[in-house]
């Protein structure tokens, strides 16, 4: 029988490294709650980034997935994870930097992603995975609360921005619950939250999403400017484009819905961007 998460970590004399922004979760009930929020089906193929202490890893394995692949860059955790594997042979351990791995490298038809993501690379990973959405069943992720609020934000709200637009064009997004800093050791300075993203059946093409990314970069760089002003350096005839699409050119970036940005991207030929 495996020891508790805390005892298991202590037996390996592993301490969180500040330089890596590490904060450990020892509460197995929280890990179970995250997995429940994912509605993980038996016999799923699951991917976890940054398993660390293995708490979330254990909770996932207890749901009997077909396989769980974990990607861990900190070699201190590999022996601990190997001990978990002795009880769960369907656990696959890859020592690698998550930013250096694409989902296509893992030979998945479809994968469910459940992770407590390292906050310094969380947003980058989310965007990268969304561009490989055809390979993903769904994602249940722990991120900084501020990032989750940006992912889920509606137009005309303070949190709404580029991340909101991109995520909502590719996936259905839902905030599940907040996580207090006291759930971690040591406690971080910010709250965390769990978000679930389910890729849409027919998301826009990657080429279109890349175009939307470029448009929103210009639009939200001048967040308080009218859209006709913030986009004029990118699209000289932006007034005509917005008029044709029946989008009010006095709107600011935060007033346009994700679909409005997609319509602008679709109306522009590649050579115009």
From Swiss-Prot:
Compartments, as annotated in UniProt: Cytoplasm
GO cellular component: cytoplasm
One GO molecular-function entry: RNA binding
EC number: 2.1.1.182
The organism's place on the tree of life at top rank: Bacteria
SUPFAM superfamilies: S-adenosyl-L-methionine-dependent methyltransferases
UniProt catalytic activity: adenosine(1518)/adenosine(1519) in 16S rRNA + 4 S-adenosyl-L-methionine = N(6)-dimethyladenosine(1518)/N(6)-dimethyladenosine(1519) in 16S rRNA + 4 S-adenosyl-L-homocysteine + 4 H(+)
Top-rank EC class of the record's enzyme: transferase
Name this protein carries in UniProt: Ribosomal RNA small subunit methyltransferase A
Species in which this protein is naturally found: Rickettsia akari (strain Hartford)
């Amino acid at each position: 029988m495996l020891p508790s998460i805390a005892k298991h970590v202590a037996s390996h004399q592993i301490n969180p490294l500040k330089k890596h922004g590490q904060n450990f979760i020892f509460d197995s009930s929280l890990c179970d709650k995250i997995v429940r929020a994912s509605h993980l089906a038996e016999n799923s193929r699951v991917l976890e980034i940054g398993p660390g202490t293995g708490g979330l890893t254990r909770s996932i394995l207890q749901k009997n997935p077909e396989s769980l692949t974990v990607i861990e860059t900190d070699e201190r955790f590999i022996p601990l994870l190997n001990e978990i594997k002795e009880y769960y042979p369907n656990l696959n351990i890859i020592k690698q930097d998550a930013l250096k791995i694409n989902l296509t490298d893992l030979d998945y038809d479809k994968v469910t992603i459940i992770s407590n993501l390292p906050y310094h690379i969380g947003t980058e990973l989310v965007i990268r995975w969304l561009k490989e959405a055809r390979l993903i069943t769904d994602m249940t992720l722990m991120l900084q609360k501020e990032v989750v609020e940006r992912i889920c934000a509606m137009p005309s709200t303070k949190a709404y921005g580029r991340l909101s637009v991109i995520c909502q064009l590719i996936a259905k997004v839902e905030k599940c619950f907040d996580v207090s800093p006291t759930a971690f050791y040591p406690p971080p300075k910010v709250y965390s939250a769990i978000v679930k993203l389910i890729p849409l059946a027919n998301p826009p093409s990657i080429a279109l999403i890349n175009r939307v990314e470029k448009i929103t970069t210009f639009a939200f760089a001048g967040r308080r400017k009218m859209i006709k002003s913030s986009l004029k350096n990118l699209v000289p005839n932006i007034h005509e484009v917005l008029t044709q699409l029946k989008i009010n050119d006095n709107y600011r970036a935060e007033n346009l819905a994700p679909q409005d940005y997609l319509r602008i991207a679709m109306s522009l030929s590649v050579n115009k961007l």
